[in-house]
């Protein structure tokens, strides 16, 4: 039995569930048949353990307040990183993962923006689950938004 940590920048404990949430929950449920699964994620709402979450051994939710999100987004812009990396960044979550990395055989990063939490000098296996990889959906959104809409430039 391997010990697996799932890292998500999306709140997997909130409802209603979206496609990305459902996908990683299905993956974790399947993996929990022969492995011990823990979860860390960013979120605002902390729900009590529901039936669809019972396959997680432990889960920890990190809250990021609005001012921290704005400051992190500014730092991301200055470092020429995607703005969403700053929006979904938690120093506490980064520290938690770094402190506990040696307890896990595998770390799965759910969504591309979660890869920023990859701990340095981690010797185990890592998996990047790319539900939100740049795809035709993003291309369709970019084409449908006006050039004058600032949201269009967040997708680049």
Spans of features found by a protein language model:
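N-terminal subdomain of nucleotide-sugar transferases
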Residues: 1-59, 102
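Short, well-ordered beta-to-alpha junction loops that form the rim of enzyme active sites
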Residues: 9-10, 43, 109-113, 130-132
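A conserved catalytic-core segment of Leloir-type glycosyltransferases
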Residues: 39-95
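Short N-terminal targeting/anchoring amphipathic segment
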Residues: 97-115, 125-127
């Amino acid at each position: 039995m391997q010990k697996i940590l799932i890292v998500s920048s999306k709140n997997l404990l909130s409802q209603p569930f979206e496609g990305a949430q459902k996908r990683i929950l299905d993956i974790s449920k399947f993996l929990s048949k022969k492995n011990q699964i823990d979860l860390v994620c960013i979120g605002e709402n902390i729900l009590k353990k529901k039936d669809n979450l019972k396959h997680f051994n432990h889960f920890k939710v990190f809250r990021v307040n609005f001012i921290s999100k704005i400051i992190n987004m500014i730092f991301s812009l200055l470092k020429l990183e995607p703005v969403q990396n700053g929006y979904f960044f938690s120093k506490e979550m980064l520290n938690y993962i770094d402190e506990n990395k040696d307890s896990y055989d595998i770390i799965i990063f759910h969504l591309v923006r979660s890869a920023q939490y990859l701990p340095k000098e981690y010797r185990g296996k890592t998996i990047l689950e790319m539900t939100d990889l740049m795809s035709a959906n993003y291309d369709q959104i970019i084409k449908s938004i006006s050039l004058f809409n600032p949201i269009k430039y967040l997708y680049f």
